[in-house]
Structures are given as C-alpha cells and as structure tokens.
C-alpha cells in the first residue's frame, strides 16, 4: 500500500519520513499525472523541504478523499441502478489521440471503411483485429480507467478482455431496431462482471439505451420465462421488455465519459432515427480481478495467445470467448460471403505500451 508515493517521498526526505507515512497515497489512486505534478511542485519551490512536502501531502489527501467519494457514488449507482456514468475520465488531449489513431486506421486499412456497416451489426467492430489496435490499447491501459476498476473490485491486479469498439459515421442512415439483451448467463447469480465503454463523442440520440434497475430483474426474467441460458449473451423477450418502458433511459454521454454497467443489466445501443446525424465512437473496456479461481492457467495462457495472435474477444476477461476471424453475416447481401485477408493488415505499433499491457494479462 502507498508504494508509489512512498518511493518518491523517501528520495526527498532523509529524516522524518515516518511522520508522513500515514498520509501518503498510493499512485494507483492518483495516477502518474498527479505524481508528476507533485514532483514539479516540490522541485520548483525554495521553501523548507519539509513544509513543501507537508503542503503537497495535504493536497493529495484532499484529492484522494474526493476520489474515494466518487468511487462510493459509482458503487452505489451500480448497486441501485445497474449502471453509472463517470464524467471527464478522458481529457481533450487523450480524446484527440484516440480519435487520431482510430481514423488513421479506419481510413487507411484496406476494406475497413468499405465493409464496416456491411459485416458489423449495430455499428460494433468485431473483425480486422480490432481488439488489438493501438487506439484500443491506449484506452485499455489508461491508468485512470484501470484504477477505477481496481477500486470497484478492491484489488491491485486486474486482467482484461480484448473487446472491440462501436462506430457510426455522421452520414450513417438507419432505423432503430430492437436487440435489447443481457450479457450474463441465467446460471450466474448476482454480480459477476462490470463492463464499460469510453465515449469519444457527444451522444444523446445515437447512444446507449439502458433499463434502470433491470440488473435486479435478471433472475426474475429467466425464471418467469422458464429459460435456461448457458451463454453470456441473450436477446430478451420483447413482450417482457415492453413492460419496462418506465425504466428505459437514453443515456446522454459526453466525449471523455466512461459508462459502466453490471453485466446483468438490460441494454442495447441505437443508431437513432433516420434523420439522426450524430457521430458515435466508443471503446469497450472490461476488467476482472486477476486472483480468481476462474482465471486458471488455461485462461492465462489463452489470454497471452490472444495478444500474440491479435484475437478479438467478447467483453468477459474470463472465460475468454474468441470472436471468429471471418464475418458470419453480410447484412446487405446474405448470399455474398465476405472473406477478410488478414495477411494484408498492418501490425499495430504497441512496443511503448508493452509494460502496461503485460500487467493486464
């Protein structure tokens, strides 16, 4: 506990470091940007070193108190509503970097833009090694996002899945279709997973639909309809869902927001009506505790294979479900099967992220 800041402070204090020990805050809460700010503050002052450190520690404590409060709010919203929206997790610079990397890949990788709406239902990328592109890993290894999940699961070590993203271009024209679903098997009771997306765009209409509090109806749904669903994904009976209109929320998200939800929660996305011209880009992210019996040696080995072979998966970090390499559907011409030539795809540049990637495997 408190290892990151302790190391930094111990270099600055040759005496009395135990005086500040109980106040020092783990960098897993603050993130490296806050620690860098602390360094700048300390080295830019000519005051007595001990006084400077005391002031910095007090500022850190205040920041951490606020972050602890925020985590408690997130936990309460997940418990009561089944979802939570955390504002401004990504800053403008991070949004711009993700967008730049995404569109560089989207526009310049052969067949990606041309085939996207033909083979990807509901705007969701599954193919083209989407789960291992640089923009995906930039978000997936972001310390602020990882730290939120560490706090949710009360652990210092997480593992990740290799999910894709969702993109609707502004000019996309489509009609809203029903595909409300749950991402948790009927055989799993209670909380098993929190999943999320990072929004890179502002969306009110072409957005995420969630049924508030529906995670508490998960078991009721399967019991009432006498359904045994072994898989962690199933579209829900439309008649049942029609009775939940008072719980239906079109989530208003801003660029930089992180939306987290309980995998039991009933949800879907929507492209909006035929007049909607919102652009929508979100990156799906999910993490579970590394130290769990379900994260066995086979899962650990498979996770590394997924990275080496650049396999995309569902949102569950375990058990991993690998997405088939070739499209199952052609949404415009079912009789014309499309084959992706993976030999032509460029290799993503990830060497500078390797250390952070390894921590999540």
Question: In which residue ranges do the predicted regions lie?
Answer:
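Fe(II)/2-oxoglutarate
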Residues: 2-80, 350-361
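Non-heme Fe(II)-dependent double-stranded beta-helix
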Residues: 42, 48, 66-81, 87-187
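Short Gly/aromatic-enriched secondary-structure transition segments
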Residues: 99-103, 212, 275
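Non-heme Fe(II)/2-oxoglutarate
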Residues: 112, 259-260, 264-361
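Short, structured patches in soluble enzyme cores that scaffold and shape functional sites
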Residues: 164, 182-184, 194-202, 210-212
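A short beta-loop-beta micro-motif enriched in histidine and acidic residues
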Residues: 181-193, 246, 253, 278
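Short, conserved beta-strand element in jelly-roll/cupin
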Residues: 188-204, 286-289
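Double-stranded beta-helix
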Residues: 203-268
């Amino acid at each position: 506990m408190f290892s990151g800041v302790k190391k930094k402070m111990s270099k600055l204090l040759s005496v009395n470091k135990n005086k500040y020990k109980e106040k020092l805050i783990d960098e897993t809460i603050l993130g490296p940007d806050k620690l860098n700010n602390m360094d700048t503050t300390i080295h830019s002052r000519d005051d007595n070193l001990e006084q400077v450190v005391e002031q910095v520690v007090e500022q850190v404590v205040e920041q951490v108190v606020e972050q602890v409060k925020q985590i408690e709010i997130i936990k309460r919203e997940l418990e009561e509503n089944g979802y939570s929206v955390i504002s401004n997790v990504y800053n403008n610079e991070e949004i711009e970097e993700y967008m730049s990397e995404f569109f560089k890949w989207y526009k310049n990788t052969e067949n990606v833009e041309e085939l996207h709406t033909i083979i990807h239902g509901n705007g969701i990328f599954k193919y083209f090694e989407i789960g291992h592109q640089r923009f995906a890993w930039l978000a997936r290894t972001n310390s602020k996002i990882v730290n939120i999940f560490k706090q949710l699961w009360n652990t210092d070590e997480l593992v990740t899945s290799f999910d894709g993203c969702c993109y609707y271009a502004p000019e996309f024209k489509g009609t809203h279709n029903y595909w409300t679903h749950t991402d948790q098997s009927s055989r799993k009771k209670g909380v098993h997973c929190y999943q999320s997306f990072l929004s890179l765009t502002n969306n009110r209409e072409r957005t995420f639909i969630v049924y508030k509090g529906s995670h508490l109806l998960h078991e009721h749904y399967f019991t009432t309809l006498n359904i045994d669903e072994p898989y962690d994904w199933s579209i829900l009976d439309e008649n049942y869902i029609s009775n939940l209109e008072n719980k239906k929320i079109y989530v208003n998200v801003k660029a930089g927001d992180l939306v987290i939800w309980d995998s039991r929660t009933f949800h879907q996305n929507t492209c909006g009506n035929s007049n909607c011209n919102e652009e929508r880009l979100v990156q799906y992210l999910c993490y579970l505790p590394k130290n769990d019996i379900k994260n066995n040696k086979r899962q650990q080995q498979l996770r590394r294979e997924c990275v080496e072979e650049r396999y995309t998966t569902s949102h569950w970090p375990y058990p991993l479900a690998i997405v088939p390499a070739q499209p199952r559907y052609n949404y415009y011409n079912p009789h014309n099967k499309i084959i992706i030539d993976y030999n032509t795809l460029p290799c993503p540049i990830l060497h500078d992220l390797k250390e952070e990637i390894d921590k999540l495997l």
